[in-house]
């Protein structure tokens, strides 16, 4: 991949460009891994400065210029108790507005061309105005009464700027029309059926300009008996959230809204904060010192800076013209509300709390099941979470989770993005050693550069504690007959060999019980070689693995078999050597590299001299299943190399093979271990990109652990996924004897279903200033990059907008989508940078394997350049994965995306021109088509149902059932539609006459259920047919060459036939796996429907043993009909 990561230190190797190197977007690839926080390197990319046309992903404005903007009519805030704080939502008045007048006709937008906005740096000695927080429904209602400019979307691809506001009596939503009667430009609140988030109406889906509109800024009001839609776009996701939350509150409480808002002021949270105040005010004076107030708030929210809390109190006193520093209870509560409420979490809470100010156990259960994908949840588990994270005693006793408890929970390790299943060994450890990637260190003894840097045993301690399973010992003759370790022919310092072996003995299995490989580069005399042997035997003892390889085997032993063993990788005397010593080729990687590259540049490689040295038999006998040999070429290795022989490749040579012989390299690594080490030209100890070699199956990619940056981030992140044990099982397509895979593919992988990764960057918390920044003050202008690292087809990146002058609680609210073609080899990297940097822009990063992602709302704990956790610094994100395979992780939700029938593509098998074999593959075509039809019919039906429910394809069926459940209730709260759960495939049964829109939902549900039933009942038979064809074809595998020769195929055609055979076998296995995963996904869908029906009380009486739960108003639902736009 192009080295697109930010904040990495070190220099690139000019002679070894990454094979996928290239510019993406406005980025320009340059030398170096990137110049991060003090690493001394150069930036790997030019910094991205995008001025994209149209609507940017996060800045939801559609770019009105000049007189296309209009001013707000200047409404004041509510004059009732709900107007506790000024609104943060109305937004600034456009510069070019026309005061007091109606907007001109040019407010119609026909395209989304965005004008470049000026950005001026300012210095402020007070809080930023945008820091005013939404902390309750009253804040939302107050903001709506003040009004906001929103964009109104019509079906003709036109967009109108209108000023929307809520009437002071909270009975109607109205907007300023351009020419029509103002009475037609309003909607009664009581007529609103639903408020839908995102672009999930027919108007949005069919609109030509929809692609330019951010999903996070769009929402729709469904109203009237005909379910018309008013489709709107806010200037920011925050404004959209305010309107959605406020309108839903109004729908829920109707004429009782004011009473509810007034009563909510004296809520559980306020009581708890008051109690905190009273515990400090022990004398009952009614006030506390500023110091005590600041310390209390910091104790409750450790991420807040003392200076920021003090500033808030001082601003409050200044606004009241109050002298002194004493803090009253009311002031303490007000500042706490403002500083400790995260609006994005408040908006999330009210989605699941039916607009209460807290979550009860059932609300929390629904959140965990529907959003977080937690299986087997019950009220007891919900109560445990509440008791663990709810700070107030009242909440714990009542089983209520307040906004503070919910925030505590979401920020806890329980809700980190990393799947805790992967914190322990979770992969099959009984495969041959060659089937694993192995965490490997190069020049382990160095703690700086490899030319003049110091050597130290702490390098070994650090690497072994990090789970490294392959370390390097470059051994030379030392004084006093004691071998030493250092980089030969350089000015690096020396350490005694014996002390290193002592440290290895102590820490070898500190982080992992699986085998440790010692890569010996032996340059010692015979005399000191014997000293090496004595030290290793005496210190390591039985840990040394010296068992001779089994000649009858074809593969190396497994990590499981080799637990607790230390393997020596080094040169070994030939078996016919009878003396006590013999000569072998030199081990100097630098010298060997010169020879290898020399061979590539001359016509007669035999003329290149090979250096040799003497090896003693005792040292040779310590080498068992990791015998070092020189690589010749792939075809020679396939024929003569033994499975216990290991070849080392310089990165330049390995890159050459990766680019020119990717298929051979992958096949070679199925049986043999390959070690790739950095070029000696990297004198600054910079790192190569390990992904360039992992994608070819290379197991031992040696990294300079002492050099932080992007490449080490990838290495460290990658090996987290299997309990950090140092071994990661390679993808099946890299292990199977017959499989078709090219490391450099820029398309989908045969037999592997692509996954769609949806990531929403919601907000950030407590970003520190870059360590190497030369700018004064603590202000940062953060933005976030999301990078995908993997095979070339998967390498991609996206960035958010910059949030100016807010590193404490920036709101990004931007969504990105990535197609992942080989999920098992993909990694996701979050990088936070400062857009106003001097000298250093790197704030923090987090790198995670795709397979370790947890879906739902998650926090990403940020790490420094050197890998330390940044205290309290995190990103808040939402993750969804669609069309994810369903096996192995039942708690992960399998989701699907729809493909139209016209675009349906069936997997194609290739012709070998070998009649008997082609006949077998021909028989496989019908079941492949059947499997595809079963899968895609199910996926299409599910997505159709999601759309009718007003949800996107990212939603799951549980969320769909929650969305439609309120509309299935009649005026008397009795269900109009129930689900009969006594049948294997639950049916919807009408209990009364229902509107056409509900009938359409029921009909679409029935069609979906039929597709689910068809897949479940037919999948096994189709699967068996595909597997039978695969087995029948494999019977030809061993003798395919001879069969092809008899058919008259010559060399090139014969090779093509073998390749086609491998392709076909890969396709058959992939299709069988996809069908199996689809069946698991379908069974999961049925479980979700069942659970949701019971939770919403929509199950037919007597069809479910669980006590029917009281139906609760959901937040989504019902298809709509486009509005006639009477109020334009």
UniProtKB/Swiss-Prot annotation:
It is found in: Cytoplasm. Disulfide bonds: none annotated. Keywords: Acetylation, Cytoplasm, Phosphoprotein, Transducer. GO terms for biological process: B cell proliferation involved in immune response; B-1a B cell differentiation; gamma-aminobutyric acid signaling pathway; intracellular signal transduction; lipid metabolic process; negative regulation of B cell receptor signaling pathway; negative regulation of cold-induced thermogenesis; regulation of synaptic transmission, GABAergic. InterPro entries: C2_dom, C2_domain_sf, EF-hand-dom_pair, PH-like_dom_sf, PH_domain, PI-PLC_fam, PLC-like_Pdiesterase_TIM-brl, PLC_EF-hand-like. May play an role in the regulation of Ins(1,4,5)P3 around the endoplasmic reticulum. PANTHER family: INACTIVE PHOSPHOLIPASE C-LIKE PROTEIN 2, PHOSPHOINOSITIDE-SPECIFIC PHOSPHOLIPASE C FAMILY PROTEIN. One of its GO terms (cellular component) is cytoplasm. Residues 619-735 form the PI-PLC Y-box domain. The modification N-acetylalanine is found at residue 2. This is Inactive phospholipase C-like protein 2. Pfam families: C2, EF-hand_like, PH_12, PI-PLC-X, PI-PLC-Y. Residues 20-30 have a biased composition (Low complexity). Residues 1-129, 1100-1128 are annotated as: Disordered. Ubiquitously expressed, with a strong expression in skeletal muscle. The gene is Plcl2. Residues 31-43 have a biased composition (Gly residues). Residues 1107-1128 have a biased composition (Basic and acidic residues). It comes from the Eukaryota.
